[in-house]
Regions:
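Ribokinase/PfkB-type carbohydrate-kinase core domain
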Residues: 1-278, 290
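Short amphipathic alpha-helical face segments that pack within enzyme cores
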Residues: 281-289
Length: 290
């Protein structure tokens, strides 16, 4: 990252300047039973419940030296990832942050016209804030990325556009709707536990390779609980592909959307040991293809 005096440094050298915002995360494995009084619930698939203590995330203070370094060294930055707006609740503050971000993106493009601006969606604490964010920043980004829960929430609950995330063709059409609605420049990435896919125009980068890297790093983290080492990623290569991912791959390949869709099945884990930070690992993996 970039220090306050503008140097590129390892994160170990950075000092904390704000109060920590601990997350309380309760993981549930597929088949677990939760008992509340006389009620009993069986977990249908591995997931987690996150209870967030809001501190600095509610304001998202920007480090100006970080943005300045990227703008001054844009030719060295092949992709520029935007995220972390999801805990903001004040629309005026969000507008201020987004306007700054749009100016930053414009400056980055001047220094690197081929650079990829990548926006990772999240679970927002306010629907109105999420709408403002997507509608403001969407046209400035090359790729908008989200998981299938966010695809479902955005189209079915926020905009009543309609998508069935259990149907891969509906999901492809949903990704196309996302791109159209927000004016995303190149395409949309959808990532799930069974597959990941890119829907949009052809890229100079090998996005299929990026999706593979993303899937492997996310699965390695699900299997080990931390960012996968080379040896741990090698272990994941021995896993088989899941039925849903393979079925979706074949369906897309035979569909009218085959030319504009790249789908990669994930290595299958029925009961992952960990379900935290998998999206972040996926996004990190994808960046390697740029």
């Amino acid at each position: 990252t970039v220090s306050q005096d503008g140097r590129l440094v390892h994160t170990d050298e950075i000092r904390q300047t704000n109060e920590q915002g601990p997350h309380f995360i309760i993981q549930f494995k597929k088949g677990d039973k939760i008992c509340l009084g006389a009620q009993e619930m069986v977990i249908p698939c591995s997931n987690r419940l996150i209870i967030t203590k809001i501190t600095v995330n509610e304001f998202v203070p920007f480090s100006k030296p970080y943005f300045r370094w990227i703008e001054q060294n844009a030719s060295l930055v092949s992709s520029n990832v935007l995220s972390s707006f999801n805990a903001l609740l004040n629309p005026e503050l969000l507008k201020e942050r987004l306007n700054f971000t749009k100016e930053h993106v414009a400056a980055y493009r001047v220094g690197n016209p081929e650079g990829i601006v990548f926006f990772e969606d999240a679970h927002f604490h306010s629907i109105d804030v999420k709408k403002l964010c997507l509608e403001t920043i969407g046209a400035s980004v090359d790729i908008l990325s989200m998981n299938e829960e966010e695809l479902n929430h955005t189209l079915n609950h926020m905009y009543q556009e309609g998508v069935d995330v259990e149907d891969i063709i509906s999901s492809v059409e949903g990704a196309k709707s996302i791109r159209r609605m927000f004016g995303v420049r190149k395409g949309v990435v959808i990532h799930t536990k069974d597959y990941s896919m890119y829907v949009g125009e052809p890229l100079k980068a090998d996005i299929e390779r990026g999706l593979i890297y993303g899937n492997l790093l996310a699965t390695a983290k699900a299997n080990n609980g931390w960012y996968g080492t080379k040896e741990q990623v090698k272990e994941v290569l021995e896993f088989g592909f899941g039925d849903r991912g393979m079925k979706n791959y074949q369906t897309v390949r035979e569909s009218k959307y085959a030319e504009e869709t790249v789908l990669v099945p994930s290595k299958y884990m029925d009961k992952p040991k960990f379900t935290i930070g998998l999206g972040d690992s996926f996004v990190g993996g994808v960046q390697m293809c740029f």
